[in-house]
């Protein structure tokens, strides 16, 4: 057994465990405070979200855009930690994050992910890869020259702003009619995203979380939308203080 040979890179394990737990609870919040039974379509959708964020990272790497690299790495942590939870449950997800810091994302991580997935013949392979991707996302943030925990918190706080209260929606649309406000918000979300290169969002609708008194907007594929209350993470401000 090798001992006292490798230099340890410090990571706040508890912080990243709490971040993953935040993601798990955040997704439950979108579904009335309960975790659903995961079906095949949900796994396909969540894997798609991971792929989308890995693509953002690869594009940022080509441009050496540090803001977008950090944003994408944090987003990959968010979507992959939930995918790991879907495969393994909460206890195992948090246990994976006890691993020491390893390597970082390659500059072609999106291409690498696609190539690897094309060889898979068993769902277990994607499950294991998802755990690796989650840790790579964490380690990419930790090994950057920037304040990794501030960046992660900024992204988590930004995600929380996707869940408006009734009061916030009424204020945005200057009305006392919540049904009208919801209708206008759904239309606005579709309009804002009509020209996305990846394709427009369709079938946008809202659900109400009775327990936590917030609204959540989804498209017809189950992706959580960014309503008018969404606050984009200001990563540029954080790295400017480096």
Task: State where each predicted segment sits.
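Flexible "arm" and connector segments at domain edges
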Residues: 1-242
């Amino acid at each position: 057994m090798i001992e006292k040979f490798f230099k340890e890179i410090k990571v706040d394990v508890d912080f990243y465990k709490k971040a993953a737990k935040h993601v798990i609870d955040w997704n439950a919040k979108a579904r009335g405070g309960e975790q659903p039974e995961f079906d095949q379509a949900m796994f396909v959708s969540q894997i798609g979200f991971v792929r989308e964020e890995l693509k953002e990272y690869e594009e940022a790497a080509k441009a050496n855009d540090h803001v977008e690299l950090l944003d994408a790495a944090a987003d990959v942590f968010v979507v992959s930690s939930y995918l790991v939870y879907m495969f393994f449950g909460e206890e195992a997800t948090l246990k994976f994050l006890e691993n020491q810091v390893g390597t970082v994302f390659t500059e072609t991580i999106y291409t690498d992910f696609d190539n690897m997935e094309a060889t898979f013949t068993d769902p277990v392979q994607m499950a294991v890869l998802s755990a690796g991707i989650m840790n790579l996302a964490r380690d990419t943030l930790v090994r950057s020259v920037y304040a990794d925990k501030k960046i992660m918190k900024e992204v988590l706080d930004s995600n929380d702003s996707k869940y408006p209260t009734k009061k916030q929606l009424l204020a945005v649309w200057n009305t006392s009619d919540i049904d009208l406000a919801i209708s206008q918000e759904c239309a606005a979300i579709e309009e804002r995203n009509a020209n996305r290169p990846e394709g427009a969002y369709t079938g946008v609708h809202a659900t109400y979380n009775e327990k936590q008194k917030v609204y959540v907007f989804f498209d017809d594929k189950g992706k959580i939308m960014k309503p008018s209350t969404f606050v984009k993470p200001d990563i540029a401000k954080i790295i400017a203080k480096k």
